[in-house]
Amino acid sequence: MKIAYLMRHDITKNDGVTKKVLDQTTEWKKSGHTVQVFCYVYNKGKSIIVDANQYKIRPPLKNKFVLENDLLKDLEVFSPDVVYYRYSTLNRTLRKVLSKYKVVTEVNTDDLGESKLLWEKERNLKSFARYFTYTLFRSQILKKVQGIIAVTKEIAELPSTTKYDKPTVYIPNGIDLEKYQTIKKQNEAYERVGLFFIGSPNQPWHGVDIIEEMSKKLPQYDFHIVGMEGDSSENLFWHGYLQKDEYLKILKKCQICIGTLALERKNMKEACPLKVREYLAYGYPTIIGYEDTAFLENDVDFILKLKGNKVSDEAIEKIGSFIELVKKMVVTSDLIQNIDIIELEKRRLSFIEDIFKN
């Protein structure tokens, strides 16, 4: 097949999303398919997706109503069998694409639910416009696609997804395990157990406040937070934003990692974040506050799933027991094959091929 990967994202930042797209398209090419990335960016620049076609995002109104003729011409020359669209908002160019090509869309979030929560919290014009836009245009996209791939079972089963009666499958995020070397050492000496978290500011569902509370109730352990600023204490250390080589130095001193702890604040129960896949690939048992899509069918002893977003005495007891149980454990690649991108992309390609043939 010839697959056009259409997306709107700043791929010049070479962030987790960019790495995911690179890994996906690399696997597709290995399977014998011809793939080209077509990407809207704010500023053109170098990217790890070196052969991507980049198109500068216009101001909001122009972006909505003016055709991106360069992109449409490039698509026509490429002549894809299927367009794989990383779901975003609707514009006039996308309308053209939806009317001309077979389109499979990848849905990564409950955008309606998230934008509604933001509007209820902020009550300003910007958040209302966002919610209104998603509500108005979502149906116009999903009505016209030929297939939907959600990253979680929860998203795949939302009424706002199922109401369009489209072929739908859920495939969680994965990573290329061959690119990761185990960092955690099984018998390495350490004075105190360290727990590691990395995230971004202003994301209340990360549950950083829960980590702060954990540090107070578990003073015998050290907690390291990367990606945001704060006031450090005797056992809670805020490191701010760090480049990868810098935060890996901190990770190497830790024994356990922490993922998102308060996903319920987004009215969601299930997720599959890339950072948790990286924790596991580096060998670290992990504490999370949600159901992970890749582990819905089986409980594993290297993941602790906390319920609720409050640090009760019962939760603290579970956390303490888990830490003592796994502090010397190393998660090996044979235990996490269900997050390996090779197997996940085989499933994705099978779904895309079914759409193409039908």
Segments the model singles out, each with a brief description of its role:
Residues 14-19, 202-206, 245, 249-250, ...:
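Nucleotide-sugar-dependent
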Residues 154, 174:
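Carbohydrate-associated surface elements
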Residues 1-45, 78, 212-218, 222:
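N-terminal subdomain of nucleotide-sugar transferases
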Residues 17-27, 176-179, 191-232, 237-247:
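Conserved catalytic-core segment of nucleotide-activated headgroup transferases in glycan assembly
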Residues 307-357:
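A charged, aromatic-enriched C-terminal amphipathic alpha-helix characteristic of glycosyltransferases
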Residues 26, 68-73, 93, 105-115, ...:
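Membrane-proximal helix-turn-helix segments that form the acceptor-binding/catalytic region
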Residues 72-92, 101-104:
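Short N-terminal targeting/anchoring amphipathic segment
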Residues 8, 12, 104-136, 162-165, ...:
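Acceptor-binding helix/loop patch of EC 2.4 sugar-transfer enzymes
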